[in-house]
Regions:
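Acidic metal-phosphate-binding loop of nucleotide-sugar-dependent transferases
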Residues: 38-40
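Acceptor/aglycone-binding surface of glycosyltransferases and processive sugar-polymer synthases
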Residues: 9-25, 30, 42-123, 127, ...
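Catalytic donor-sugar/metal-binding loop of nucleotide-sugar-dependent glycosyltransferases
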Residues: 122-123, 134-151
Length: 184
């Protein structure tokens, strides 16, 4: 295994771990995720908060695939994979999901605690934590609402997704979840 591959694996696991650690230590009632690469500006978070507290949904999920993106924001292969997973998740979860891997998500802490308590149901192999949260939210009967954002070019860091390696892993997770949700 190359050093670059090892570092990418550490970063992915670290991202998932840091989100979980932050959520565990949070003292407020509302939990928010915003990726550090600033592809979504922090100024968008009040829209997510408003959608949650107004009761529009229980789990507010960012969507990068509605508005035109800046030129370098997402590679074509990633865009195609995102659209595939969106269709698969919409069918699988029985509610429309337009973007499964947007890092911007907002939910109630009490709902997250229920998701975390039942995480074992889908396994603990999600390298980024997005599928884990979406599967858990659907399993807990939460209303997932997509909220479009304007996706920008990365201003910090590099992508942590290795499209083929992680794409295959995410596909395996979706198939596993399909057996747990649709064919129980």
């Amino acid at each position: 295994m190359s050093l670059e591959s090892t570092l990418t694996d550490i970063c992915c696991k670290r991202q998932r771990h840091l989100v979980r650690l932050g959520f565990a230590r949070a003292t407020g009632d509302v939990l928010m995720i915003l990726d550090a690469d600033l592809t979504v500006p922090p100024e968008d978070l009040p829209r997510f908060y408003d959608a949650l507290v107004s009761g529009k949904g229980d789990f507010i999920n960012g969507v990068r695939l509605v508005y035109p993106m800046e030129q370098e924001a997402m590679r074509l292969a990633n865009l195609i994979a995102n659209k595939f997973f969106s269709l698969a998740f919409s069918w699988l979860l029985g509610q429309p999901i337009k973007d499964t891997l947007c890092g911007t998500k907002v939910l109630w802490k009490s709902d997250y605690e229920r998701i975390a308590a039942h995480r074992h149901y889908f396994g603990d192999v999600d390298p980024f934590g997005d599928f884990d949260l979406l599967f858990g939210a659907a399993k807990q009967g939460l209303k997932i609402v997509d909220l479009p954002i304007r996706y920008r070019d990365r201003t910090y860091g590099t992508t942590q997704i290795q499209r083929w390696k992680h794409g295959v892993l995410l596909l395996r997770m979706a198939i596993f979840a399909c057996r747990r949700i649709k064919f129980v």
